[in-house]
Amino acid sequence: RLEAADRVSRGLPAAGQAVVMTKWMGLEGTAILAQEKEAQLLARFPRVMVEKAKGFEKYLSILPEAATAGKSGVSFMQAVREGGIFASLWELAERAGVGLHIDLMKIPMDQTVVEICNYYDLNPYEILSSGSALLFAKQGQQLCEELAAIGIPAAVIGQTTDGNDRIIQNGEEIRYLDLPKPDQIRKILNYSAKMANKGE
């Protein structure tokens, strides 16, 4: 493990850097559900919501984020992928050798993602989230503004810390990130039979 001064001198993040997240969690997982379970979802939700979920596919590239990161003093960047935002936060902290303090309420979400995940009893924080990126930066708000200027919503969701703890805070409640779990989307592969109880 690198000491804080070594991380700075080698261009790696020290404690106190902003953790920035782009777009919204659960984009790809929700798009897949909307495409593969369209008829079922239309029986429960308005067509406009299902079409919106299918349209999340257009957000899956993170090339613009990468281009901005390269000129904005970003020390680390990672695509949010399988296992969702929780898995990617863990993996990025491991790569960077830092702890994390994340405010759960600041993680960007879309209500469509939440409602579709709730329908299938899936955790939206642990579902395939390609299209979103995590970045460590000294000037988090400035990075968010630079991303907004090219049409990419972003938010500071926490900061890096010394030590190994990966803390998720939800109001006064504190929890610690677990090791990454299998992606929630995998549940759907064996879920169809159970959905009979929901009127499939």
Language-model region placement:
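Glycine-rich anion-binding loops of enzyme active sites
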Residues: 1-36, 159
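Short, compositionally biased
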Residues: 31-48
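Active-site glycine-rich loop that binds ribose-phosphate moieties when present
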Residues: 1-12, 48-67
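Solvent-exposed alpha-helices and their adjacent loops that cap or buttress functional pockets
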Residues: 10-14, 32, 67-71, 94, ...
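Helix N-cap motif at beta-to-alpha junctions
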Residues: 136-142
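Acidic, Ser/Thr/Pro-rich beta/coil linker or hinge segments at domain junctions
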Residues: 150-200
